[in-house]
Structure formats: structure tokens, C-alpha cells
């Protein structure tokens, strides 16, 4: 009987896992999603702090830390050049910012003890655990590839919507809406699912089982950041080249 009671209590704890509770600030009559802002500011502070440490005293013979950041920069350049082509240079900061923000955000969900900070409603989690963040990142990507196409081709950029035949106009327009949606939902779904799986396993077996899952989550979080940055660069390159 005690075993059944413990199992039922475990299921009850799992049923209490919340996905949709939010904590809001009221600013000038508007509701501001405070959880995302707080965690995003922490991630931005980590990135800015790391950047300051990396560039404050550069050495001719790089130190271990400088070597690491130079490797990251070279990796981002390679991704940008592969997807965009020879005109990749101006887009390295954008692609790099996307990759690093998503990467650190994803890892913060597993490595930072967000839940020790008590909120009136909901709880803190990785910024990319919220659909508002992933949609915002996807919309920024949309603005970037429209800007890339318009800056390269002018108004002639819009001729792609009637190629190879005007009949495809609705489909080509719909494609530009589905690109950011697919980016945002893929990232949101993977990060949310990873955190929920860890929470459920911790509720059932709190000591051993969640550890391998957390390591797997760190790996997949890095892959998701790379996929998002790679697809963003590919969309920008596609808009500049004008092919599908």
C-alpha cells in the first residue's frame, strides 16, 4: 500500500508541473513578461561580461581564454561563409549574436539554478523556453533576410514571388511566413520538452536518472543553437542569391 501511495504522490507532483504560468510587470499600462526579461538580461550580462574579458587585454600569443573566443569567432565565420557566400562579412555579427544568445540561453536552463528565485507567479527558466523569445528571434531573422534581399536587389527582390510562374505567388508569400514560424516552434518545442523531461524525471527518481538526460539536453541545446544560426544564414544567403 505504501508503494502505491508513493507512486500516486509522484504522479500528483508531475501533474503539478506548470507550462503556462507567467509573471508580469505593469509598465505604462502595458503587461510586460517579466520572466523572459529577467533571464534574458542575465544571459546578455554573461555574454557582455565574457566579451569584455576576451578583448580587454589581447595578446600576440593568445592565452587559453583568448584562444577559445577566437575559435568561436572562426567557427561563426565558417558557418556564415558556407551559407551566405563571399559576401558573408557584414552578417557575421548578426549570425554570431543569434548563435551565442540562443546557445547561452539554452544552457542556462540546465546549468543555472533559476528555481531558487521565487516569483509571485510562475518560475524562471531559459529565455528560449518561452515562445515569445523564439518568435522574436525568428522575426529578427525575417527582417534580416528581407533587408539582405532589398539591399542587394532593390525592389527587384520582390520579383522572386512570381518566379517561375505568377501562379506560385500565394505559395511563395506563404513560404516567407512559414520560415520564421518553423524556426521559432522548433527551438521552443525542443527546449521546453527538454526541461519538462528533466522536471518529470527529478520528480520520479531525484538522484541518478536525470543526470544523463541533463547531459543529453546540453548537447541538443547546442545543436539547436547551431541549427537556428545555420538556417538564419541560409535564408539570408538565399535572399541575396534569389534562388530556392
UniProtKB/Swiss-Prot annotation:
It comes from the Eukaryota. It is a multi-pass membrane protein. It is found in: Plastid, Chloroplast thylakoid membrane. Gene3D superfamilies: ATP synthase, F0 complex, subunit A. Keywords: ATP synthesis, CF(0), Chloroplast, Hydrogen ion transport, Ion transport, Membrane, Plastid, Thylakoid, Transmembrane, Transmembrane helix, Transport. The chain crosses the membrane at residues 35-55, 92-112, 131-151, 196-216, 217-237. GO terms for cellular component: chloroplast thylakoid membrane; plasma membrane; proton-transporting ATP synthase complex. GO terms for molecular function: proton-transporting ATP synthase activity, rotational mechanism. Belongs to the ATPase A chain family. NCBIfam families: ATP_synt_6_or_A. HAMAP family: ATP_synth_a_bact. F-type ATPases have 2 components, CF(1) - the catalytic core - and CF(0) - the membrane proton channel. CF(1) has five subunits: alpha(3), beta(3), gamma(1), delta(1), epsilon(1). CF(0) has four main subunits: a, b, b' and c. Key component of the proton channel; it plays a direct role in the translocation of protons across the membrane. This is ATP synthase subunit a, chloroplastic. It comes from Gossypium hirsutum.
Amino acid at each position: 500500500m505504501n508503494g502505491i501511495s508513493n507512486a500516486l504522490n509522484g504522479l500528483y507532483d508531475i501533474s503539478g508541473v506548470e507550462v503556462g504560468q507567467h509573471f508580469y510587470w505593469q509598465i505604462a499600462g502595458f503587461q510586460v513578461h517579466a520572466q523572459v526579461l529577467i533571464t534574458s538580461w542575465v544571459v546578455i550580462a554573461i555574454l557582455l561580461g565574457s566579451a569584455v574579458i576576451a578583448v580587454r587585454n589581447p595578446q600576440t600569443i593568445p592565452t587559453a581564454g583568448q584562444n577559445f573566443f577566437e575559435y568561436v569567432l572562426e567557427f561563426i565565420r565558417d558557418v556564415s561563409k558556407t551559407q551566405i557566400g563571399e559576401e558573408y562579412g557584414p552578417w557575421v555579427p548578426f549570425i554570431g549574436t543569434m548563435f551565442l544568445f540562443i546557445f547561452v540561453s539554452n544552457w542556462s536552463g540546465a546549468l543555472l539554478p533559476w528555481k531558487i528565485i521565487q516569483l509571485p507567479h510562475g518560475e524562471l527558466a531559459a529565455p528560449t523556453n518561452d515562445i515569445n523569445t523564439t518568435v522574436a528571434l525568428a522575426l529578427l531573422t525575417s527582417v534580416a533576410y528581407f533587408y539582405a534581399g532589398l539591399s542587394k536587389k532593390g525592389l527587384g527582390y520582390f520579383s522572386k514571388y512570381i518566379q517561375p510562374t505568377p501562379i506560385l505567388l500565394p505559395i511563395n508569400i506563404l513560404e516567407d511566413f512559414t520560415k520564421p514560424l518553423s524556426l521559432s516552434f522548433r527551438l521552443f518545442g525542443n527546449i521546453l520538452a527538454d526541461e519538462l523531461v528533466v522536471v518529470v524525471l527529478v520528480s520520479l527518481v531525484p538522484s541518478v536518472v536525470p543526470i544523463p538526460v541533463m547531459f543529453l539536453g546540453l548537447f541538443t541545446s547546442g545543436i539547436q543553437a547551431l541549427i537556428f544560426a545555420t538556417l538564419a544564414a541560409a535564408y539570408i544567403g538565399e535572399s541575396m542569391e534569389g534562388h530556392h
